[in-house]
């Protein structure tokens, strides 16, 4: 089964907790703090595996959670960093943040890697907090939570040339005679429901990869007939071969087919019209094909070169392949996304709002504090130790949260909530 789009959940490993410990060794007076730092949590790393051709495996496993770092130990020993969680994906996979739509990675080459969810740093042990005024601190940090997100994986096949056209115009037959690919061929519409790839040899030491894409119908750009799933695979191609049925046996008019398919390409992605397009008049071995071709040429004009062929008899196929190979030599790869879009995506990754916090009030009068920085600080605080609690209170004041609460009318004894935890506000 060919699967080209899935949604999954990924989470980097939490950092290991720092430790509160002291040196208690014979002949070592005033040993001091000796709590080690926690180890870094593992990253979730996507790696391209050349042998994969589909996202099928992700239908059975949709949650990927990396291991947390090892906790700090006594005698100043730091916790071990966890091994990264490696997730293998096929070449041509695009990873998007489900919430923001941000493009996190475009993975195309073998063994290319991308960190999709970063592990948290390890919490600091009490030896890190020693000062001249507090030489034996009773404080350590919990590990930083690992990054977590829902992501969408989209697979867009890697091919130099894409065959497009209405169903049953002979795309699969053409691919089968010019390559060793063996797509399913039958006398009914939508025989091809997944992309088929074949390596084409032109006979003069040139070769390219051709994709037989499922047939398009009117309205495909808006999703009709699974149009989105089919059209996304055209985006990586450099040359489009537009196959048109000249036999008239299906009752369609060749020129109308030509206009309709090009309109669908334009409506789906304007940049598809920038690609060179080779128009192929197929089924020229049929009785009325020559007459239909002349009528098609009259409507189309002289600006478009047409290659009459018969995929069944191989008439005209050699000239077609040479033309495609020539176009590929002069056509650069088309970037999947504009530079502006990439720049915006990199800015989104900074999460500019994370340094802020928000205070809301529930119907029972409880003040609710939310925001990336305060929630991370809260999770990294060990509330079982008084010194850690006092440090957290200082951090809240440093962020301006105490002042903001007073401005909203908070007084002694009011309930303040962060995540699922509640405590009293003390002015």
UniProtKB/Swiss-Prot annotation:
Its cofactor is Mg(2+). GTP binds at residues 165-172, 190-194, 212-215, 282-285, 310-312. PROSITE patterns: G_OBG, GTP1_OBG, OBG, OCT. Its main location: cytoplasm. Residues 159-329 form the OBG-type G domain. GO terms for biological process: ribosome biogenesis. Residues 1-158 form the Obg domain. Coiled coil: none annotated. Keywords: Cytoplasm, GTP-binding, Hydrolase, Magnesium, Metal-binding, Nucleotide-binding. Signal peptide: none annotated. It is found in: Cytoplasm. GO terms for molecular function: GTP binding; GTPase activity; magnesium ion binding. An essential GTPase which binds GTP, GDP and possibly (p)ppGpp with moderate affinity, with high nucleotide exchange rates and a fairly low GTP hydrolysis rate. Plays a role in control of the cell cycle, stress response, ribosome biogenesis and in those bacteria that undergo differentiation, in morphogenesis control. NCBIfam families: Obg_CgtA, Obg_CgtA_exten, PRK12296.1, PRK12297.1, PRK12299.1, small_GTP. This is GTPase Obg. It comes from Bacillus mycoides (strain KBAB4) (Bacillus weihenstephanensis).
């Amino acid at each position: 089964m060919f699967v080209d789009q899935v949604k999954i959940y990924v989470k980097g490993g939490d950092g290991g907790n720092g430790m509160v410990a002291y040196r208690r060794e014979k002949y070592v007076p005033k040993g001091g703090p000796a709590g080690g730092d926690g180890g870094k949590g593992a990253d979730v790393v996507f790696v391209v595996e050349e042998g994969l051709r589909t996202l099928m495996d992700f239908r059975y496993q949709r949650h990927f959670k990396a291991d947390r770092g090892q906790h700090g130990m006594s005698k100043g020993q730091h916790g071990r960093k966890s091994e990264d969680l490696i997730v293998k994906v096929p070449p041509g996979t695009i990873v998007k943040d489900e919430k923001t739509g941000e493009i996190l990675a475009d993975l195309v080459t073998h063994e290319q890697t991308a960190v999709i969810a970063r592990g948290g740093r390890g919490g600091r042990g009490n030896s890190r907090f020693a000062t001249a005024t507090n030489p034996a601190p009773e404080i350590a940090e919990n590990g930083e939570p690992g990054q977590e997100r829902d992501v969408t994986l989209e697979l867009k096949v890697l091919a130099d040339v894409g065959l497009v056209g209405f169903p049953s115009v002979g795309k699969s037959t053409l691919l089968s005679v010019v390559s060793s690919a063996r797509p399913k061929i039958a006398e009914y519409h939508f025989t091809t429901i997944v992309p088929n790839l074949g390596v084409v040899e032109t006979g003069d030491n040139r070769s390219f990869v051709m994709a037989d894409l499922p047939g398009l119908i009117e309205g495909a750009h808006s999703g009709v007939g699974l149009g989105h799933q089919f059209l996304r695979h055209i985006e990586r191609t450099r040359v489009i071969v537009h196959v048109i049925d000249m036999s008239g046996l299906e009752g369609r008019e060749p020129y109308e087919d030509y206009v309709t398919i090009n309109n669908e390409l334009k409506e789906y992605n304007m940049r598809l019209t920038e690609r060179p397009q080779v128009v192929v008049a197929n089924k020229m071995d049929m009785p009325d094909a020559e007459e239909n071709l002349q009528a098609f040429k009259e409507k189309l004009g002289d600006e478009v070169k047409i290659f009459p062929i018969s995929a069944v008899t191989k008439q005209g196929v050699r000239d077609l392949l040479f033309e495609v190979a020539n176009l590929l030599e002069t056509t650069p790869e088309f970037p999947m996304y504009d530079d502006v879009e990439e720049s915006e995506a990199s800015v989104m990754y900074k999460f500019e709002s994370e340094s802020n916090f928000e205070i809301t009030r529930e119907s029972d009068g409880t003040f609710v504090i939310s925001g990336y920085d305060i929630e991370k600080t809260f999770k990294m605080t060990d509330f079982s130790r008084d010194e850690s609690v006092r440090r957290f209170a200082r951090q809240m004041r440093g962020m301006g949260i105490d002042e903001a609460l007073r401005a909203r009318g908070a007084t002694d004894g009011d309930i303040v909530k962060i995540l699922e935890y509640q405590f009293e506000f003390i002015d």
